[in-house]
Amino acid sequence: MDQFPSLVMRAHAAARQAGFPLTREEAGPDRPSACLPGVGRFLAVLAAGCGGGRIGELGTGAGIGAGWIASAMPADCALITVEIDEPLARAARELLTADSRVEVITGDALRVIPGRGPFDLLFADSGVRDPADFAVLVSLLRIGGRIVMDDVTPEHGLPPDASLRADDIKRSFFTGEPRLTWTEVVLPDLRNSLLVGTRTT
């Protein structure tokens, strides 16, 4: 795979043109941001192993994460990506329209995704914050399926009162979820990490 697949490059260009934040720092605490390159490459590695499977993405955004996934997944794999913001969903649909394996849906991902499983890979890139919703997502995985959540601050970067950090809710859920074997992957910038878990039961 190229360092940056052409589909990802086009998604980046569209994001810049639309003013969509490319980093969490640009976005601030209450806005979504684009899929970082380190996260995208990680997703590509997982997607490449989903032959004959189904991948779900909660929060299409500018389509960068979907671009990484679609560029790597096998020909017999399907990607369902859901975005609640109509202009973003429309732009991503235009970007991905040539790939019949990809379906871009406008709507609330937590309402749409449960009806489309089971999944071999789920990328929860939207503002999922409720542990009950996290548990639902795990239930949508096949045994052996994987879930990835990004926009997490590494533990060494958390403030003293870490209980107030929204991303620590994700880490706490993964820690206490008995159906997952999981780990945290710190990205090269040392300011961002992602959580990845495999459903075992």
Labelled PLM ranges:
Residues M1-L121, V128-R146, V152-T201:
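A short alpha-helical cap/connector motif
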